Amino acid sequence: MIQTVVVYFSASLTLTLITPNFKSNKDLLFVLLIHYIVFYLSDFYRDFWSRGYLEEFKMVLKYSFYYIFISSSLFFIFKNSFTTTRLSFFTFIAMNSILLYLLNSFLKYYRKYSYAKFSRDTKVVLITNKDSLSKMTFRNKYDHNYIAVCILDSSEKDCYDLKHNSLRIINKDALTSELTCLTVDQAFINIPIELFGKYQIQDIINDIEAMGVIVNVNVEALSFDNIGEKRIQTFEGYSVITYSMKFYKYSHLIAKRFLDITGAIIGLLICGIVAIFLVPQIRKDGGPAIFSQNRVGRNGRIFRFYKFRSMRVDAEQIKKDLLVHNQMTGLMFKLEDDPRITKIGKFIRKTSIDELPQFYNVLKGDMSLVGTRPPTVDEYEKYNSTQKRRLSFKPGITGLWQISGRNNITDFDEIVKLDVQYINEWSIWSDIKIILLTLKVVLLGTGAK
């Protein structure tokens, strides 16, 4: 997808600057058609992430030679059908080759850099037994952050040394319940296969996987069935089989972040313009214009969440008295004609203007344009393992819930189902679709209150 943009840019720039009487639609369609043919004939997509920079250079040359050969053949057959000159064609080939190589090299570098950053921030729980733990070597060159350990054949009092190293000790009988409350991204199960039955490892895998937490198991567990997907990878120097409900295309994850940054910049520009007129109206009651609150993000991370204030300053205190009137079933609070909402608040909630400051959260990386809605800390503390699954993806400003009736949904379990559906079926295309549908919902004011 990204390579197509480069090809289109190179072709349109070259043809516009060099070719007289440029027939844009016809010639550009021809260029893109050849690109797709050459892309697959040259195996340009194969082993993309494992190719080194020299191999990438060779692949771009191979792609370019294929492009020249096929284009020349078509030019000969349809020589009177195109306005492209030899100068513009070879200028395009040179520019396109350079830009493709630079783009692909950048994607590889960005992936390597972002993976290192992700690894440093990855919270890992270790599940093992005493014998396997004694054989493990923790190397500084691996940046995964162990935060807790569950030793299946030891009592808590036997784990003094691990406590001394600031590792949280989890009792094997409370493993699932404690992981539900912890900020944890991955679990590493390192235990001999002959003990899997004794300690019900398959049940542990399924329980943790159901939370949306990635599970890494020693590669000997390859024969085990699981409810999601699995891959063989390396983890801390070990060969492991990694279980996850779904593995996403890395190119789509990069595209999602680029989309977030672009959308956040545009959104913040709009937010700044709106704030000039809106802030004085909100502050008429003497309170701040911006409401901020701790919310829970991906896998339990706490971040500061921002909105234009649409409620009274003492809204959180009044909420305690209104809980008996909650119209939501489950771990969310919703009340039609909420008495805490100010006069200007009704307008900005109806038009969704109150959400604009969240573009700052998106730019920071705490949130995404599309995702699940971030719960409050008190709501999160009551989650079970199934409900925590909705936090395995970065929270968003909009999502399936917002375009599926928004305030018409009153059952929290239905929201969880929509969130899990989004996570299971996610691709960059689903995000784009949800953004477009959200614009429609906001412009029509459908379901917003």
UniProtKB/Swiss-Prot annotation:
The entry's keywords: Capsule biogenesis/degradation, Cell membrane, Exopolysaccharide synthesis, Membrane, Transferase, Transmembrane, Transmembrane helix, Virulence
Residues annotated as transmembrane: 5-22, 27-46, 59-78, 88-107, 258-280
EC number(s) recorded for this UniProt protein: 2.7.8.-
InterPro entries registered for this protein in UniProt: Bact_transf, EPS_sugar_tfrase
GO cellular component, one term: plasma membrane
Any single Pfam family the record assigns to this protein: Bac_transf
GO molecular function, a single term: phosphotransferase activity, for other substituted phosphate groups
Segments forming a coiled coil: none
Function: Galactosyl transferase is essential for the assembly of the group B streptococci (GBS) type III capsular polysaccharide. May be involved in the formation of either or both galactosidic bonds by catalyzing the addition of galactose to an oligosaccharide precursor or to a lipid intermediate. Type III capsular polysaccharide consists of a linear backbone with short side chains ending in residues of N-acetylneuraminic acid or sialic acid.
Annotated family: Belongs to the bacterial sugar transferase family.
NCBIfam families in the cross-refs: EPS_sugtrans (TIGR03025)
Annotated protein name in UniProt: Galactosyl transferase CpsE
Provenance organism: Streptococcus agalactiae serotype III (strain NEM316)
Classification lineage: Bacteria, Bacillati, Bacillota, Bacilli, Lactobacillales
